[in-house]
Regions:
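Membrane-embedded segments
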Residues: 131-224
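Hydrophobic membrane-insertion alpha-helices, especially the h-region
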Residues: 63-84
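Histidine-centered active-site loop/cap adjacent to the catalytic His
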Residues: 407-455
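N-terminal targeting leaders characterized by basic, low-complexity, disordered sequences
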Residues: 1-42
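Active-site segments of SGNH/GDSL-like serine hydrolases
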Residues: 338-366
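Substrate-gating cap/lid alpha-helix
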Residues: 358-393
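Secreted/periplasmic serine-hydrolase-like ester/acetyl group-modifying domain
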Residues: 204-344, 439-472
Length: 472
């Protein structure tokens, strides 16, 4: 076995010594840092925490509000502009009636009466007139000849409408009261169908919802009336699209003599040009009364009598078809309304506008067909005597001294000359009421049949009596 080679010796380890001959100590290991102690959270004061949050919210709220404040004038302008222009009539009423009322309030007479929505005009007048008139008139077309001249009141306004029924009468006055413009005097030309309880007594143009509102809120009569929800309606005021539409409409019609509606159609209601008494069409006066065209106002007695004769066959169709008896319900409504007006501080003056002599003479020949009609006047006379209510006129033309056929336009409508024969004017009526010198309502006895008239004297179409016609 061969011997291994001689191993190489390891080199000697050099030991460094310090100057004193001592070997240095082994290097010490670096001590570990002690783990930091976990700090204990300081508990917040709840009050301070709340105040801090509150201040923070207020700060950011004010910061946001300061930016929004810059938008407020713009929003206010949009709302005000849309409300006043209101091209769709959401708040101010339809454009055509608004134009009529605006012209009347400026003192203008207005053309094209036959095309007017009279009921809208009346309601918008109540809304827009700044101060309450001293006196207003209500009733059907039979009241429309009362004006500022024959009533003697400079601020009188006639709120009568064609075909007015009991609902039109009462709601016209109610609108004035609800707008805070209660008149001192209410002149009511009361028609017999006010006391008829049938649907035939109602006009389809009357505002039934407004009447139900009046019955429910004022007279406490149960109806199906419900307060309308106007939230969605008022949202339109802040609608940018509605604002833009109103701007377009305003720019289009500003300064124009011809005004259009929302659809671009011309609104044919304009100030009367020239003498109002020389117009070829019927016009609406600035006081609400009506001035018929010159041809209708200047008819001869024969022409007027012919129209009265034509009304004989259709008399009951004027809200009195089947009117055999006064309605207890309508009597109660009338009495409640009169009490309501007194509570508002309004003096009510009742007027019975006469019918043409030929027409009334015909009616008393068939009293069985007009029982309800003939009951009304005597009942009203008893009511006025009992309650000290001023009453002027009579349905029976023979009860009015000096009344002539030419004091009428036709069978139903008495002219201003006829009114002057029985109505002294509002100032004198109020004076008579104050001094206790009112005409005695029970001193007048209207004819209700031939038994209360001369049975041998009945007027015919040509103006003769039946007695003289037989002799001829």
């Amino acid at each position: 076995m061969a011997k291994s080679p001689t191993p190489i010796p390891a080199p000697p380890v050099k030991i460094q010594r310090d100057t004193n001959g001592v070997a240095p100590a082994a290097p010490a290991t670096k001590p570990k840092k002690a783990a930091p102690k976990k700090r204990r959270k300081r508990r917040r004061n709840p009050l301070l925490w709340f105040l801090h949050g509150l201040i923070r919210r207020i700060y950011f709220g004010l910061k946001t509000a300061s930016r929004l404040v810059l938008l407020v004038p713009i929003l206010v302008f949009m709302v005000a502009f849309s409300y006043n222009v209101d091209r769709s009539g959401l708040f101010q009423g339809a454009l055509a009636p608004r134009r009529i009322v605006n012209l009347m309030l400026q003192g203008y007479d207005v053309t094209n009466f036959e095309q007017m929505d009279e009921r809208q005009v009346v309601q918008l007048f109540a809304q827009d007139v700044e101060q309450a008139p001293e006196a207003i008139g209500i009733g059907s077309s039979r009241v429309l000849q009362f004006n500022r001249e024959n009533t003697g009141v400079d601020t009188f306004f006639n709120m009568g409408v064609t075909g007015a029924d009991v609902r039109d009468n009462m709601t016209s006055y109610y609108k004035m009261v609800s707008y805070g413009k209660t008149p001192k005097v209410l002149l009511w030309s009361i028609d017999p169908w006010v006391f008829y309880g049938s649907e035939d007594a109602f006009d389809s143009r009357a505002d039934a919802d407004l009447y139900n509102e009046f019955l429910t809120k004022v007279l406490n009569v149960p109806t199906d009336y419900e307060e309308p929800d106007k939230v969605e309606l008022w949202k339109a005021l802040a609608d940018p699209a509605y604002f833009q539409g109103n701007v377009d409409y305003y720019i289009k019609n500003r300064g124009q003599t011809t005004v259009t509606d929302d659809d671009g159609n011309t609104i044919e209601f304009n100030p009367v040009q020239g003498d109002p008494y020389d117009q070829t069409t019927t016009i609406k006066r600035s006081d609400g009364s009506v001035l018929y065209d010159v041809a209708f106002r200047t008819q001869t007695a024969d022409q007027i009598r012919t129209l009265a004769a034509e009304a004989c066959m259709s008399f009951n169709s004027v809200h009195m078809e089947g009117f055999d008896e006064m309605s207890t319900t309508q009597i109660q409504a009338f009495e409640s309304f009169m009490d309501y007006a007194r509570e508002q501080g309004t003096t009510v003056i009742l007027v019975l506008s006469p019918w043409h002599p030929y027409l009334y003479g015909y009616l008393i020949t068939e009293p069985e067909l007009h029982k309800g009609f003939f009951q009304v006047e005597n009942w009203l006379r008893e009511y006025c005597a009992k309650n000290n209510v001023p009453l002027y006129g009579s349905y029976d033309p023979e009860c009015i001294d000096g009344l002539e056929e030419t004091d009428f336009f036709d069978g139903l409508h008495c002219a201003g000359t006829g009114i002057a024969r029985f109505f002294p004017g509002i100032p004198q009526a109020l004076q008579q009421l104050e001094t206790g010198t009112l005409p005695d309502p029970l001193a007048v006895h209207p004819r209700t049949s031939l038994e209360s008239a001369d049975p041998d004297v009945v007027e015919t179409l040509n103006g003769e009596t039946a007695e003289t016609a037989q002799e001829g």
